[in-house]
């Protein structure tokens, strides 16, 4: 079995002649958390959509769970999407369902699972993600940060091998962003799942990254350990770090 769970091999993607990904190569090992960073519009979320099979590259190969999924059809991709789940920036919750029903939704079509087992799994995840007190509420009755936690719980419902987070701390206040990052860190340390986190937040990146992919003008400008990123003197990397150093990180544990 390959050490790499996810791998990009020279992936390129353009939209209307605008190149978003340009010969991008990186890998994520089993159980590792890789953070993808870069300024807005450099293709961070586009990379995640390739892993899920929502987009296909113009060139290059995408490997997931030891399989080259580049040319797979929707039926084949359904198998990968049971192994890899994605937490969208919007949360993508069902407005008409309660929080508990949203978390349970991926399990409803699973064969061989009873209602009692579904209820137990929902309770377990609600406790883990600290949303047990809102299980009977609908999404419109909870905060954006709580919606993110519910979306993460739903993504974990089927016990996937890997989870992709798309900007998990955006559009929330700093305190909730810090709380969300602490929840993701707790999951990293307890579940040890293969993970990719897309973010522009260096505080979150430093907290979570085993290694970092930094995209610049559609290319991989840096791929390696966080400490090497922090010490790099490349001007665009240094400038990116400096912009976040102006915003103090919050520690909700103190």
Identify the role of each PLM range.
Residues 97-105:
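Short coil-to-helix segment of the ABC ATPase nucleotide-binding domain corresponding to the Q-loop/switch region
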Residues 138-142, 146:
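Conserved ABC ATPase signature
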Residues 68, 116-133:
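Conserved ABC ATPase "signature" region
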Residues 227-254:
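C-terminal boundary and immediately downstream tail of ABC-type ATPase nucleotide-binding domains
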Residues 52:
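Helix-to-loop junction immediately C-terminal to a conserved catalytic motif
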Residues 163-166:
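Catalytic Walker B motif of ABC-type/P-loop ATPase nucleotide-binding domains
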Residues 159:
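Conserved catalytic motifs of ABC-family nucleotide-binding domains
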């Amino acid at each position: 079995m390959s050490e790499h769970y996810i791998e990009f091999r020279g992936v390129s993607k353009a939209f209307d002649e605008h190149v978003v990904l340009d010969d991008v190569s990186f890998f994520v090992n089993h159980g590792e958390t890789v953070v993808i960073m870069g300024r807005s519009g450099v293709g961070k979320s586009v990379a995640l959509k390739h892993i899920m099979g929502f987009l296909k590259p113009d060139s290059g190969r995408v490997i997931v769970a030891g399989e080259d999924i580049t040319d797979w059809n929707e039926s084949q991709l359904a198998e990968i999407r049971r192994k890899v789940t994605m937490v969208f920036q919007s949360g993508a919750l069902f407005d008409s369902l309660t929080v508990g029903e949203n978390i349970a939704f991926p399990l409803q079509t699973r064969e061989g699972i009873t209602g009692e087992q579904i209820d137990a799994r929902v309770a377990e995840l609600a406790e883990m993600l600290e949303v047990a007190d809102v299980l009977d509420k609908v999404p419109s009755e909870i905060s954006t940060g709580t919606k993110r936690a519910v979306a993460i719980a739903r993504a974990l419902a089927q016990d996937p091998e890997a989870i992709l987070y798309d900007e998990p701390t955006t559009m929330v206040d700093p305190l909730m962003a810090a709380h969300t990052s602490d929840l993701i860190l707790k999951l990293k340390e307890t579940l040890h799942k293969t993970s990719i986190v897309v973010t522009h937040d260096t505080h979150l990146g430093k907290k979570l990254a085993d290694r970092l992919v930094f995209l610049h003008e559609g290319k991989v400008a840096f791929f390696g350990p966080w400490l090497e990123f922090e010490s790099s003197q490349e001007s665009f990397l240094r400038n990116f770090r400096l912009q976040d150093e102006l915003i103090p990180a919050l520690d909700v544990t103190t």
